[in-house]
Amino acid sequence: MSRRKQAKPRSVKAVEEAESTECASGWDSSVQTDAAVSERDSDRKESRAVGEDGEQSVTSHDERVGEEDLDDDSIFTCDNCQQDFECLADLTEHRTNHCPADGDDDPGLSWVASSPSSKDVASPSQMLGDGCCDMGMGTGEEEGGSGLPYPCQFCDKSFSRLSYLKRHEQIHSDKLPFKCTFCSRLFKHKRSRDRHVKLHTGDKKYSCQECEAAFSRSDHLKIHLKTHSSSKPFKCSICKRGFSSTSSLQSHMQAHRKNKEHLAKKDQGKRDGSSSDVTEQDQDLYMCDYCEETFSQTDELEKHVLTQHPQLSDRAELQCIHCPEIFSDEGTLLTHIDRTHANKKHKCPMCAEQFPSVEDVYCHLDSHRQPDSSNHSASPDPVLGSVASMSSATPDSSASLERGSTPDSTLKPGQSRRKLAPSSDHDDGTWSGKVTYSCPYCSKRDFNSLAVLEIHLKTIHADKPQQSHTCQLCLETLPTLYNLNEHVRKAHRSSGNSASNFPLLQFSNVSAFHCNYCPDMFADINSLQEHIRVSHCLSGGVVAGSTTLEGNHAFFCNQCSMGFLTESSLTEHIQQTHCSSVGGVTKMESPVLQPSQSFMEVYSCPYCTNSPIFGSLLKLTKHIKENHKNIPLANNKRKVKVADLSPASSDVEISSPKRHRVTGDSTPAVANGDYPCNQCDLRFSSFEGFQAHLKSHLELLLRRQSCPQCNKEDFDSQEALLQHLTIHYTTTSTQYVCESCDKQFSSVDDLQKHLLDMHTFVLYHCTLCQEVFDSKVSIQVHLAVKHSNEKKMYRCTACAWDFRKESDLQLHVKHSHLGHPASTGAPGKARKCIFCGETFGTEVELQCHITTHSKKYNCRLCGKAFHAIVLLERHLREKHCIFDGGNGNGNGGSQNGTPNGVTQSSKRSTAGSTAAAEQADLQNMLLKGGSQETANSHEASGGEEELDASEPMYACDICGAAYTMESLLQNHRLRDHNIRPGEDDAGSRKKKADFIKGNHKCNVCSRTFFSENGLREHAQTHRGPAKHYMCPICGERFPSLLTLTEHKVTHSKSLDTGTCRICKMPLQSEEEFIEHCQMHPDLRNSLTGFRCVVCMQTVTSTLELKIHGTFHMQKLSSSGGSGGGGGSASSSPNGQLQAHKLYKCALCLKDFKNKQELVKIDVNGLPYGLCAGCMSRGTNGQSPTVVVTPQEAGDKGTTGLRCSECAVKFETLEDLESHIQVDHTEMSPETSGAKKVTDASPVPKKKTYQCIKCQMTFETEREIQIHVANHMIEEGINHECKLCNQMFDSPAKLLCHLIEHSFEGMGGTFKCPVCFTVFVQANKLQQHIFAVHGQEDKIYDCSQCPQKFFFQTELQNHTLSQHAQ
């Protein structure tokens, strides 16, 4: 989502309605002419908004209304003449110079331009409903109508002005959910509210390069930069005045047109309607804006302004102090002074002072323009009139002098120095003249509105601390001047008051301060006290007109004007407060003042011992109300207003608030032998007492300021005291502020949590249709409505396959289940495959099906078997990093390479005949397996490798998967590739070709692949194997764990010996080596696995142990052969055994010298060899599972009977047969003869029954059954997983669940911890462990009991269940 560019200053907006407002100054406005309206419309169309990228774009009104963020571009409206402006500077200049109704008595009408943050608030005059503009303006336009150019987007109303529309949209609070906490304005979007809040919070990132001013928006900075610009290229054709923009010039021309219309109406009124037409001469009259004198030429008007109103002329602003030349801008003036008057000293033209720079001279000239009163401006409002001295106060300014009395020395001469308009006196009881305001930091006092003053404070004095403005009437503190003005207008103004005689009553509902002894009224408390002390006080301090009988005696202190009821209390007050010793009688005489002498007003509390200094009477009054509420003051009717606001003496150089300190050296006047003190009006009879009294005054003046907190008194100035006192109230803390909502947090974690909870949106993306939703419920509804389509599936109950169409299911039943009924001779005795559970009608069909489960391609490294050669080659590349497919084929590919059947060019006709021949050969082998001819036929045919190579295979032309039967290939193509058996036409071949072509292409050989993983595996073949395994002995890296194991064997120091290093027993073969390693159980480690008894290296699996045995035995045979060739007379028998390897039958364990004497059969994917005798017993109906070993045949009482299915050993033949009938009823007798024998454990053990729960072993089945029954009685049938608290009904299911725990997050693959075979199901891995690996292969040992486990999760569950405290 792109963010809209910041609003830029635009030209003035045209006025679309007639001006119907009559202002208070007596100017009557009329409807503008059509020419003026058309001119403004053309100017509006030609106005362009310049963006940040420097490009210009014309924007019409309709486009601006349709913008999404229209609420963020405020319109500035003049409340006097109802003109709309889009630029803050244009409105300010209009109100200052051009607005004809700017002389009204409402200073709050220019509220909109007070600051960038206040332009979004409703106008005070609009909220209160008063003002000169509302008298003539009807409310119909603001309420809206129909057919107007600015329609509301929430209702059917439309408005004639954009400002009315924006004001109306604020009432739709339900449509505008985001509210500004500062000005309560509503917004439709959160980003608009956040951008607006920055105007309040002061996020000022746009700084001025000319001064230290900073702004939050770029358009405000551009407005400010115009104050530094000296160019005014746009000139007025009437008065030749220059302007910086066309909008300012246009607004100025409107003033000229209104002057003409006003003169025309005035002239027509004088003629009493005698002539209806206005002459051409009257239309050309030009009127002065200040005295209403008319002129026929513009030159005469300019000459009149320069001569009669020089203080108001624009040309009188910048005049050289050395010569009468006038300049239009400050830069030209300074350049003129540097060039022409560079050698002259900078001297003040009004006094004899000299200054080092021109800037200092101009700052000094401002001091000559200050009036005698501390109130710099003639404001009509008692609260707002003295902004500099009464309203602006910081929270810690109670101990500082008034800012208004100390002008800022850093003021630049370029700031406006326009002189004040002459204000009329108040003697006639009426108020007239222009309202002006003064700055509390500098000497500027010609601000005609609070808005202009606010802009001045925020631009020129932005580095000053934040001000708090206090109301003089109720002492309430307000943040801005605008808020103070509104507070006075609402809280202290009575609508029904008549203020014709007293102008102060126009702005306050509180009556002026009344004198208790005469009907006079005064605007402030200082004037009232001075009036009482001068007019109503006699020589003895008694107020004139009061009598002692009535008890109205009032005695006032000449020093601080405090009132007392008795003369004794007044005398005591003077002795304690104003002097250390009384030398004479106190008399209340007003001293003679010299108005021409400058003075400084200071106030101090008379009730505090160490009184702080107050710069204004307001601060002293607030201090007395807060700290001295119970002290009685002068008894008069205005006790609260007069007595509480009485000023007190100060211990600085000026004591009285209305006295002037005499600067010249003067001696006390001696009259009638008395020495009067000119500081406190005390008289002394002796000169010594008078000198002692003066000494006390000097001590008070020289006494240093003390800190009220720590009583430190070494402060030379008030600023030093204030800086020191600030330290006591200042503390620093680190807070983390949210940029969006300005909330503060003490730590980064709390802020991040707040951002995640409040300012982070979680979106939900539908991957099916790419739609985005903002809540989980929404996307659930979307999935339920759009993507939850019912679809009927057809499932085969025999093999649990699902089909989308009924025809596909029928085809599957036809090929897989039709035509295989059970034998009639043996009802219910259908042959069932022990591997997949599928049933067959005849034994031949079952045997043919069993061949599909055989895996003819075995890995010579790890013993894993595969159906197809391509799978074996992939296994060699991935697991063993062998890239030659022929090297890894241990059975069918070692001599003859790839089988002939694994080709894509297999024909169905030949495949059918080959399958029939295969069935005939298999049946003949089963019937004549015990004869010698069978063995001879095997020898004649060239061995089992040739038989394997001649077997036909049906390969998939898409993925390369090979099957022994065509039906299996068809099922594979239907299940995995969705290709039906009948699709053999050209269309299906095209579809097949498109399907075969993958989307992932190799950049090296241009081969395509279906998935990215396949391409990644193929790319590894070009780069070579990745070496991730490092040898801990030499640091060399290897691509697989197998190659690393083979490398580690080469570091063995026992390379030429085949003896055990522990018991020194010689080892002759690999089988003896493995058997002997198991005879030393103390060498086994639960963490790392086994140890080789020859080289003592630690191995982690039986596979690695086999590699060690092969390596050591090969070294032993090679060393023995070399020794025999060296001249040994007789060869050792060990060498003969090694030269002639023996092969054993899997059932009877007889040894055979030739491998061809054994018949190969695969059971569970593993190859086994059976002799001819075992095969003949299987065909004659004898149980092949009953096996008597030749070694134990001659021993009495010892038998070797094992079950071929579960490899459990039995003592008698009856026990084995009963076990098969009970536990393995579905096992085929023809396939049960293959016995599973591992090379690692050729010696049978005594205990053959083991409990899965506690791993105890038993000799007989009855013992383990009793043991399992005890488990069920004691512990129940439920078995709980301690890792996740899930319940299972058997220990085997619990073990399968623990295997899943071990491989969580591994991508759905399960790897055997012993031989590293990978499975996709946990139960398959469990079956593999039970079938291949035994008790000796377990890795993890329990530290508290002798139990061992394959997986760590088994050990953890065992520890929590059996050994938990």
Curated annotation (Swiss-Prot):
<feature type="zinc finger region" description="C2H2-type 20">
    <location>
        <begin position="857"/>
        <end position="880"/>
    </location>
</feature>
<feature type="zinc finger region" description="C2H2-type 22">
    <location>
        <begin position="1000"/>
        <end position="1022"/>
    </location>
</feature>
<keyword id="KW-0805">Transcription regulation</keyword>
<dbReference type="Pfam" id="PF00096">
    <property type="entry name" value="zf-C2H2"/>
</dbReference>
<keyword id="KW-0678">Repressor</keyword>
<feature type="zinc finger region" description="C2H2-type 11">
    <location>
        <begin position="513"/>
        <end position="536"/>
    </location>
</feature>
<keyword id="KW-0804">Transcription</keyword>
<feature type="zinc finger region" description="C2H2-type 18">
    <location>
        <begin position="794"/>
        <end position="817"/>
    </location>
</feature>
<keyword id="KW-0677">Repeat</keyword>
<feature type="compositionally biased region" description="Basic and acidic residues">
    <location>
        <begin position="37"/>
        <end position="51"/>
    </location>
</feature>
<feature type="zinc finger region" description="C2H2-type 17">
    <location>
        <begin position="764"/>
        <end position="787"/>
    </location>
</feature>
<feature type="zinc finger region" description="C2H2-type 12">
    <location>
        <begin position="555"/>
        <end position="578"/>
    </location>
</feature>
<feature type="zinc finger region" description="C2H2-type 25">
    <location>
        <begin position="1201"/>
        <end position="1224"/>
    </location>
</feature>
<dbReference type="GO" id="GO:0006357">
    <property type="term" value="P:regulation of transcription by RNA polymerase II"/>
</dbReference>
<feature type="region of interest" description="Disordered">
    <location>
        <begin position="1"/>
        <end position="69"/>
    </location>
</feature>
<feature type="compositionally biased region" description="Gly residues">
    <location>
        <begin position="885"/>
        <end position="895"/>
    </location>
</feature>
<feature type="compositionally biased region" description="Basic residues">
    <location>
        <begin position="1"/>
        <end position="11"/>
    </location>
</feature>
<keyword id="KW-0524">Neurogenesis</keyword>
<feature type="zinc finger region" description="C2H2-type 29">
    <location>
        <begin position="1340"/>
        <end position="1363"/>
    </location>
</feature>
<keyword id="KW-0479">Metal-binding</keyword>
<feature type="zinc finger region" description="C2H2-type 24">
    <location>
        <begin position="1090"/>
        <end position="1112"/>
    </location>
</feature>
<keyword id="KW-0539">Nucleus</keyword>
<feature type="zinc finger region" description="C2H2-type 14">
    <location>
        <begin position="675"/>
        <end position="697"/>
    </location>
</feature>
<dbReference type="GO" id="GO:0008270">
    <property type="term" value="F:zinc ion binding"/>
</dbReference>
<feature type="compositionally biased region" description="Low complexity">
    <location>
        <begin position="112"/>
        <end position="126"/>
    </location>
</feature>
<feature type="zinc finger region" description="C2H2-type 19">
    <location>
        <begin position="831"/>
        <end position="853"/>
    </location>
</feature>
<dbReference type="GO" id="GO:0043035">
    <property type="term" value="F:chromatin insulator sequence binding"/>
</dbReference>
<feature type="zinc finger region" description="C2H2-type 3">
    <location>
        <begin position="178"/>
        <end position="200"/>
    </location>
</feature>
<feature type="zinc finger region" description="C2H2-type 6">
    <location>
        <begin position="286"/>
        <end position="309"/>
    </location>
</feature>
<feature type="zinc finger region" description="C2H2-type 4">
    <location>
        <begin position="206"/>
        <end position="228"/>
    </location>
</feature>
<feature type="compositionally biased region" description="Low complexity">
    <location>
        <begin position="386"/>
        <end position="400"/>
    </location>
</feature>
<feature type="zinc finger region" description="C2H2-type 5">
    <location>
        <begin position="234"/>
        <end position="256"/>
    </location>
</feature>
<protein>
    <recommendedName>
        <fullName>Zinc finger protein 423</fullName>
    </recommendedName>
</protein>
<feature type="zinc finger region" description="C2H2-type 9; degenerate">
    <location>
        <begin position="437"/>
        <end position="461"/>
    </location>
</feature>
<dbReference type="InterPro" id="IPR013087">
    <property type="entry name" value="Znf_C2H2_type"/>
</dbReference>
<feature type="zinc finger region" description="C2H2-type 16">
    <location>
        <begin position="736"/>
        <end position="759"/>
    </location>
</feature>
<feature type="region of interest" description="Disordered">
    <location>
        <begin position="885"/>
        <end position="916"/>
    </location>
</feature>
<keyword id="KW-0217">Developmental protein</keyword>
<feature type="zinc finger region" description="C2H2-type 2">
    <location>
        <begin position="150"/>
        <end position="172"/>
    </location>
</feature>
<feature type="zinc finger region" description="C2H2-type 26">
    <location>
        <begin position="1249"/>
        <end position="1271"/>
    </location>
</feature>
<keyword id="KW-0863">Zinc-finger</keyword>
<dbReference type="GO" id="GO:0030154">
    <property type="term" value="P:cell differentiation"/>
</dbReference>
